[in-house]
Amino acid sequence: MTQTVKKVVVAYSGGLDTSVILPWLQENYDNCEIVALFVADVGQGAEELEGIEAKALASGASECYVVDLKDELVENYIYPTLKTGAVYEGTYLLGTSMARQSIAKAQVEIARKVGADALCHGCTGKGNDQIRFESCFAALAPELTVIAPWRIWDLTSRESLLEYLAERDIPTAASGTKIYSRDANAWHISHEGGELEDPWNQPSKQVWTMTVDPIDAPNEPEFLTISVVKGEITAVNGEEMYLIIRYTYLNEKAAAHGVGRVDIVENRLVGMKSRGCYETPGGTVMVEALRGIEELVLDKITRKWKHTVAAEFSHLVYDGRWFTPLCASLLAAAGTLAEEMNGEVIVKMYKGSVQAVQKQSPNSLYSEEFATFGDDNVYDDQSHAEGFIRLYSLSSRIKALASK
């Protein structure tokens, strides 16, 4: 390789790709004296992290840092994004997108700590994640060299990766029979590949790993009371819980009712469409609860603007632009609007659906006196509406007259 690298920090998962990256780096970067491994615990599950440090060191790493990012992910990425109302293309709750940027930031911090001069990720050249990682690297550590093996090496398939390890007698638990590509964190789990690559195929039962099939969910609905303070979920059924515990609790409750499944074809940043199945049970409940409060407290023009911001912010997050001035500005604006978002929502979970069925807020703009269809003494002269309608429709009237 033409690059001179002395020390590199690898975003290491212990999976097949990054297991190959370690020996590949050692073989292709002669001056790479130390490979420092960074493992992010974003809530993917204890089974995925078990023995990972020993595996990294046995594969040639001089150091291995296992960093717990669960609280960081929920507090500094998920909750702020919830305040914006961002949902990519109306469906995707951005679980992988947020996690990648939290990992990239922590990876840069480890690189600075150990004095590394390079960063390495295992993202493919066809996906969004390479852009997310490297956009964050550019914003946070533009002086560091970035190594993206998938864009360099001649290994092109899962089989070739397995062959590479076998030739070097490097053990791996991976096999050539893997069906799905999955990504899990504290917010969600995603599923891609296999029969899902044909959008005419329905997802089989083995695709879903987190939520109960709605058909098999309980025949009785379950209700949860969600407390909201300044746009943040603070308690469930009156019980305040630590942030990650609260979300884990909602995940378990909603998953048992089959809530949070989506099957979408999304527009990737790299230009192609891809199909993915996502499970975000707790997040789906939170989005619905916040929507209920938003309906009560935001006036029409503010809510319309917020929806515009939500759409734009979803693209910023999806595209890996968390560490940009625009992202910071939109987060600040959403935080200001959230000051009024206080109250309680009762959500109903049943057979894969969640619905806000009761809501109240001390900042509510809803007035039963004005809204009633019965007798009222508030809007006592309905003829006042005539002047408004004439002005409101004036442009249409002028257009019609001009067309004659």
UniProtKB/Swiss-Prot annotation:
It is an enzyme of class 6 (ligase). L-aspartate binds at residues 124, 128-129. L-citrulline binds at residues 92, 97, 128, 132, 181, 190, 266, 278. It is found in: Cytoplasm. CDD domains: ASS (cd01999). InterPro entries: Arginosuc_syn_C, Arginosuc_syn_N, Arginosuc_synth, Arginosuc_synth_CS, Arginosuc_synth_type_1_subfam, AS_cat/multimer_dom_body, Rossmann-like_a/b/a_fold. Its EC number is 6.3.4.5. It holds the Pfam family Arginosuc_synth. Keywords: Amino-acid biosynthesis, Arginine biosynthesis, ATP-binding, Cytoplasm, Ligase, Nucleotide-binding. Signal peptide: none annotated. Disulfide bonds: none annotated. NCBIfam families: argG, PRK00509.1. HAMAP family: Arg_succ_synth_type1. Belongs to the argininosuccinate synthase family. Type 1 subfamily. Homotetramer. PANTHER family: ARGININOSUCCINATE SYNTHASE (PTHR11587:SF2). This is Argininosuccinate synthase. It comes from Moritella abyssi.
